[in-house]
């Protein structure tokens, strides 16, 4: 399925995200929460990045996993989770995707209000949304 990331008007900054990887250990997950300092610290900051074992070499060659270890990442191999002390949250995968959205949208450079609805998001779609918000709001003219 395709990636979709949109922003709708809202009084608060909220992210609603669905991920689905088609693998049993990484089944469909959904999370919706207001993004505040408190929710960031309690619900998102501890969510680690993740990848299938088969992609590790490719990521290393591309220089994308510098400093990566089982202390700060989750690896999926043959339907099993490989991570120090297991998952931190039952839905750690979607939490990490929401964490990515927060980080990528910080490129807007302003405090956001609005509901982000994300389906299978990734860095390219998140950054494209950040750029579009800057364009529409006139922040690129400053």
Where are these regions (language model features)?
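Short acidic-hydrophobic catalytic motif
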Residues: 1-142
